[in-house]
């Protein structure tokens, strides 16, 4: 019988599908919020708009609905990328969109889940930021700022909840080897990119009891990039 539930936001994307599969393979009950109804193919799917407090609360409600498998972990994958030129060339709306898309769901879902994670006495939050948060590149100030904010938020959660039995860590991937990224960068050396399954393994470890001593860490997952 499954004894643990993980809530995986962004669980249907290139990385998210690998993360979902990794937890299912390890015997977790996996809850995946999505904007539209999907097929029942393993994880528990819930229609929820994670940009709203109500949507985040709905996702957590489903994740905590099985008493035999209490919510033990939240994995925040929702995000997005857009280039915007130099700072003075980037429209304000685009800068704000990057912040909203990358930071707001992470904040809302984590906020809604924390009381339940505290109640278990052994909860974990894993936030996916990006290498750009610590090694910025030009032409994407909104994205860089948003991913840095995700890491800072995770650090704040780690400090505030360490003594309450909840740990929080951040994963910092470089370029992820997904079909979408290959299509966007067909001439890149894809051998240097990180396969989603390898990142998923790191995330699953950080959500597991084996990582109990670790909180407030930023884990680089760069491959050979």
PLM regions and their residue ranges:
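N-terminal Rossmann NAD(P)H-binding glycine-rich loop of SDR-like oxidoreductase domains
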Residues: 12, 20
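Substrate-binding pocket helix/loop in short-chain dehydrogenase/reductase
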Residues: 85-87, 91-97
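Active-site helix of classical SDR
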Residues: 110, 146
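Alpha-helical segment proximal to the catalytic Tyr-Lys
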Residues: 115, 158-160
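Residue(s) in the substrate-gating loop at a strand-loop-helix junction
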Residues: 130
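Active-site loop immediately N-terminal to the catalytic Tyr-X3-Lys motif
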Residues: 135-141, 163
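C-terminal helical subdomain
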Residues: 163-166, 170, 178, 187-225
């Amino acid at each position: 019988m499954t004894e643990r539930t993980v809530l995986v936001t962004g669980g249907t994307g290139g990385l998210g599908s690998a993360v979902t599969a990794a937890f299912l393979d390890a015997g977790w009950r996996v809850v995946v919020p999505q904007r539209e109804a999907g097929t029942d193919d393993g994880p528990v799917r819930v229609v929820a708009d994670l940009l709203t407090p109500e949507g985040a609360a709905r996702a957590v409600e489903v994740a905590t609905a099985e008493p035999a498998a209490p919510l033990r972990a939240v994995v925040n994958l929702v995000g997005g990328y857009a280039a915007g030129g130099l700072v003075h060339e980037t429209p304000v709306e685009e800068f704000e969109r990057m912040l909203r898309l990358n930071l707001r769901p992470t904040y809302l879902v984590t906020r809604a889940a924390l009381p339940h994670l505290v109640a278990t006495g052994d909860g974990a939050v894993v936030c996916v930021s990006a290498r750009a948060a610590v090694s910025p590149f030009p032409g994407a100030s909104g994205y860089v700022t948003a991913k840095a904010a995700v890491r800072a938020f995770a650090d704040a959660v780690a400090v505030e909840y360490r003594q309450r039995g909840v740990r929080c860590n951040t994963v910092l991937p470089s370029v992820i080897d997904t079909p979408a990224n290959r299509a966007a960068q067909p001439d890149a050396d894809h051998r240097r990119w990180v396969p989603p399954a390898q990142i998923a393994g790191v995330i699953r470890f950080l959500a597991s009891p084996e990582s109990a001593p670790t909180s407030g860490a930023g884990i680089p997952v760069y491959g050979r990039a």
